């Protein structure tokens, strides 16, 4: 996807206090609800992006013994929650989003069609439905459109995703595949021990980046620039 140095550059502290009241879009990704689920919020101020994220891991995932990344460290950092249930309920995600809605303006939630099928009712309960046009059902063609932008954002160090290294791990586990027409898609390097859910949640959110309203704080009030 990008060079290691670019991922290290993205692993910086985010001042979440400065983002309060700001516009953002959400991305959600998972392969199986008895494995990993990730949700995140993408902000854009000028050219700089910020990605606030959280991971839920099923304690009964069959892949845990294969994973070398120190998940317990991410839990201590507050970036990850172990779920002591056989499945990760969609409500874990929507409760997290509902809490973030008290702090930020979430314009849209992006996830792919198959994942939305499971999340649909829980998202509806917090006000997000395709009918309201605040849910984006991401297709491969949408990802192809933003892949070049994602590459640019990494190469120019235009994204910060906090001090936890888990996003670095997710992204390093993904690879960019280019077809004969030059279209880019993302694939897993190894599906069981090297998870990509966090990166793909960010990719989903990036497909809705144009929904983020640019705002500035003036005398403790927010004004929309465009």
Q: What annotation goes with each model-predicted range?
A:
Residues 1, 32-37, 47-49, 59-63, ...:
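Flexible loop/turn segments at secondary-structure boundaries
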Residues 1-26:
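ATPase catalytic-site recognition across NTP-hydrolyzing enzymes
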Residues 19-44:
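Gly/Thr-rich phosphate-binding beta-strand-loop-beta motif of the actin/hexokinase/Hsp70
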Residues 29-33, 44, 111-116, 128, ...:
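An acidic- and aromatic-residue-enriched active-site/binding cleft used to recognize and process polar
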Residues 42-108:
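Nucleic-acid-processing active sites and adjacent nucleic-acid-binding tracks
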Residues 104-120:
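Short glycine-rich phosphate-binding loop at a beta-alpha junction
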Residues 122-216:
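Metal-dependent DNA phosphodiester-chemistry modules and their immediately adjacent helices/loops
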Residues 215, 219-226:
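Acidic, low-complexity intrinsically disordered tails
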